[in-house]
Amino acid sequence: MGVQTTVHLLRHGEVHNPEGVLYGRRDGFHLSDLGTRMAQRIAETIGERDIVHLRTSPLERAQETGAPLAAVRGLTPVVDPRVIESSNVFEGLSFGDGAMTIVKRPHLWRHLYNPFAPSWGEPYDEIAGRMVAAIHDARDAARGHEAVIVSHQLPIWTTRLFLERRSYVHHPKNRQCTLCSLTSVVFDDDRMAQVRYSEPAGDLIPVGDRSAPFSAGGATQEDRP
């Protein structure tokens, strides 16, 4: 066995989003009080591990999620635009009606022609490509130790599908990537050996939000995705 290095992909915590907006890459969406507790739970759970490198998405919710862990480990996070949320033409819409949100807007139908790309947002191949490049850099920075990358649900899930050689086509509610979950990529030297999944803050997630495609902390039931 060679040198083992683990890169943890950490999804951000719950976001204060009372209008249930698909926020995507928009600025101004911060962690809710519950999201802050989730971030603190991460620091408490893995803060004593051999984590020597931390990088985050540029978006506020990701940086706020990584802050408690950075403080515990005495690390200065690297802000990496390669691990940002994926782009999406539906950004800014409220999805309280689920798929009906789009059905009611015929002008948006033209974006639905190809679920394999997908035609409504950043191509899956491009998401996986930029994420894997960031993972490799984090692995190299933490070789023989552990690293954490704070990112977002779709980039993390797309990366896992790529690493496990599975189809990118999926239903958003079937993603195994809850708030503040860890998708841990274990390397043997430069070879990926396995992918692990855990939910250190799983007990803090409201039952109805576990399979939500994005976070809507503070939203009424009608406005939640």
Question: Which residues are covered by each model-predicted region?
Answer:
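Short glycine/proline- and acidic residue-enriched helix-loop micro-motifs
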Residues: R105-E126, A219-R224
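Generic beta-sheet signal
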Residues: V7, H145-Q153
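Active-site signature of alpha/beta-hydrolase-fold catalytic machinery across serine-
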Residues: P68, T158-F162
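Glycine-rich phosphate-binding loop signature in dinucleotide/nucleotide-binding domains
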Residues: E48-D50, A138-H145
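Loop-to-helix element that buttresses phosphate recognition and phosphoryl-transfer chemistry
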Residues: R11-T65, L69, W120-V132
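Short active-site segment of divalent metal-dependent hydrolases/proteases
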Residues: V15, P155-I156
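Phosphate-coordination/substrate-recognition cap region in phosphate-metabolizing enzymes
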Residues: R41-L108, R224
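Acidic, low-complexity terminal tails and accessory targeting/binding regions
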Residues: M1-T5, V78, E85-G98, H145, ...
